[in-house]
Amino acid sequence: MQLNPAEISELIKSRIEGLGVSANIRNEGTVVSVTDGIVRVHGLSDAMQGEMLEFPPTADGTPSFGLALNLERDSVGAVILGEYEHISEGDTVKCTGRILEVPVGPELIGRVVNALGQPIDGKGPINAKMTDVIEKVAPGVIARKSVDQPMQTGLKSIDSMVPIGRGQRELIIGDRQTGKTAVAIDAIINQKGQNMTCVYVAIGQKASSIKNVVRALEQAGAMDYTIVVAASASESAAMQYVSAYSGCTMGEYFRDRGEDALIVYDDLSKQAVAYRQVSLLLRRPPGREAYPGDVFYLHSRLLERAARVNADYVEAFTKGEVKGKTGSLTALPIIETQAGDVSAFVPTNVISITDGQIFLETNLFNAGIRPAINAGISVSRVGSSAQTKVIKGLSGGIRTDLAQYRELAAFAQFASDLDEATRKQLDRGARVTELLKQAQYSPLPISLMGATLFAVNKGFMDDLEIKKVLPFEHGLHQFLKSSHAALLDKIEKAKALDKDAEAELTAAITSFKKSFA
C-alpha cells in the first residue's frame, strides 16, 4: 500500500484542527524565598492586592493558596494560608485572578469551620451552594437604617444600663479573666427563638477554650442557630488575620437577605497582633507599638460592615425576592487590655470605631460582682432608642444609683457619721449591685427581668438583708412562673407594663414577699 504525502498532510491537518485544547493564559512566577509563612515571588507582574495565588499542592494533593499582600517593583510578598513546609525556592506560582472566597449560607449553621470555611468538627463536608468574597465594601449611608430594635442579651446589667440594638457595634473590653467571653456567649444563648443567626469567631484562642465554648453552646441548644469560625493559637498568623473577615462575610449573607445576625469577634487584640506579625515579616515599616500604619483600617473596614440596612437595600440585593424587610448584623468585638489600660493603641482605635463599650473590671470580678461591668464608663451610644419599653421605663434610675453608690462608697470608708440620705443611698446602691449579679449561661427573658427591676424600683427589697436579695429574686421568678404564667406571657408579648399588669405584678410580689422568709 502506497501512502500519498498529500493525503498524510491532510490527515494530520484535520487531526490538528479537531484537537480541542483550550489555551489557558495565566501569569506565572517563581518562588524566590520562603520564611515563616511569607513567600517572596518573582515574575507576577499582573498580581492584584489581596489576590489568591496558587502554590504547588501538598504531598497528599491538597491545593495550597496564598494572599498577595505586598506588591513591590520586582517581586510580590504573599502569605500562605495553611501549611507551607512543602514550598521551596524555584517552585512555580500562578495568579488565579480571584479574591479569597469562603462558603456562605444556612448550610454552615451548627458547624465549626476554620478561617477558610472548611469544616473542622468531624461531621463531614459542608455542601454550601454559594461562596462570597471575604473583603467587601460596607453599606453606604443611604443604604442604612437607624438602630431601633433591641438585641436582648438576657443580662440584667447590660439590658438595663448599656442596651444594645440590632445593627449596633458594642465593644466588650477588659483585662484577661474578667468574663468578656462569658458575656458574649450569654448574648448568643439568649437569641434562642429570636430569629437571629449567630457567628462566633475565635481568634488566637486555645483549642481547649474553643472546645469549651462549643460545648456550652451545644448544651444550651444554641448551636442550632450558630456558626463557629475557629482560628486557634496553633494556626498561622495569616489564618488568624483572615478569620474575622470570613466570619463577617458569613454573617452578611443573612443581613443582606432581610434577616438578623449577631457576630462575636473573640478577640480583635489577637487579630491585630497576628496582622502585626504578618506586616513585620513582610518588612512593612512599623509605627506605634510596632503596629503597621493601617491597623486602624484593619478594624474599621471590618466593623463598618456591621449595620442595619433598609428595605430598599435588601430588595435591590435580592432582586425583588425579599420585600419590606430590613436586615441587620450586630457586632460584639472583644478587646483585651493590659492592666486596665484603655488608652493603648488598639483599644482606643476600636473604642472610636464602635457605638459604645462595656468595660469589665478586674476588681469588681474579684469582689464577686459578675458580670463585672463598670457602670460609670460603660456606655451605649445608640442603644437607648432600641431599648424595650418595659426595661426602659424601669431602669432609668439604676445606672445613676450605681454610679453614685460607687462614688459614695469610696468616701464612706473614711467617714463614720453619715446622714440619713447618704445612708439610704448606700443601702440602695448595695442592693442594686447585688441584684445585678447573674450566674453564667443563665440569661433572663424580658418578663422576668422586668419583674426584678419593678420589685427593686418599688422598694420591695429595701428592707431585705443584702445576702437575701438574690434568693428573693430567684424565689420570685419561680413563684411568677408557677402562679402567674399568663402575666409573664402578657409582658413578654407586649414588652411593656400597662396599669393592669402593674397592679397584678404588685399584688403578686406582695403575696410572694409575705411567704418569703
UniProtKB/Swiss-Prot annotation:
NCBIfam families given for it?
atpA, PRK13343.1
Q: Where is this site: Required for activity?
A: S378
Q: Which organism does this record belong to?
A: Variovorax paradoxus (strain S110)
List the PANTHER family. Answer: ATP SYNTHASE SUBUNIT ALPHA, MITOCHONDRIAL
- Functional summary from the UniProt entry: Produces ATP from ADP in the presence of a proton gradient across the membrane. The alpha chain is a regulatory subunit.
Q: How does it assemble?
A: F-type ATPases have 2 components, CF(1) - the catalytic core - and CF(0) - the membrane proton channel. CF(1) has five subunits: alpha(3), beta(3), gamma(1), delta(1), epsilon(1). CF(0) has three main subunits: a(1), b(2) and c(9-12). The alpha and beta chains form an alternating ring which encloses part of the gamma chain. CF(1) is attached to CF(0) by a central stalk formed by the gamma and epsilon chains, while a peripheral stalk is formed by the delta and b chains.
Q: Where does ATP bind?
A: G174, D175, R176, Q177, T178, G179, K180, T181
Topology in membrane: Peripheral membrane protein
Q: Which reaction does it catalyse?
A: ATP + H2O + 4 H(+)(in) = ADP + phosphate + 5 H(+)(out)
User: Which InterPro entries does the annotation name?
Assistant: ATP_synth_asu-like_sf, ATP_synth_asu_C, ATP_synth_asu_C_sf, ATP_synth_F1_a_nt-bd_dom, ATP_synth_F1_asu, ATPase_a/bsu_AS, ATPase_F1/V1/A1_a/bsu_N, ATPase_F1/V1/A1_a/bsu_N_sf
Q: What is its EC number?
A: 7.1.2.2
- What is its EC class? translocase
Which family does the record claim for this protein?
Belongs to the ATPase alpha/beta chains family.
Q: Which interval of the chain is the signal sequence?
A: none
- Keyword annotations from UniProtKB, A to Z: ATP synthesis, ATP-binding, Cell inner membrane, Cell membrane, CF(1), Hydrogen ion transport, Ion transport, Membrane, Nucleotide-binding, Translocase, Transport
Location of this chain's protein in the cell? Cell inner membrane
Write out the GO MF terms.
ADP binding; ATP binding; proton-transporting ATP synthase activity, rotational mechanism
- Write down the superkingdom of origin: Bacteria
Gene3D superfamilies named in the record: 2.40.30.20, ATP synthase alpha/beta chain, C-terminal domain, P-loop containing nucleotide triphosphate hydrolases
GO CC, any one term? plasma membrane
| Alphabetized PROSITE patterns for the sequence | ATPASE_ALPHA_BETA
CDD domains the UniProt entry points to: ATP-synt_F1_alpha_C, ATP-synt_F1_alpha_N, F1-ATPase_alpha_CD
Q: What's this protein's name?
A: ATP synthase subunit alpha
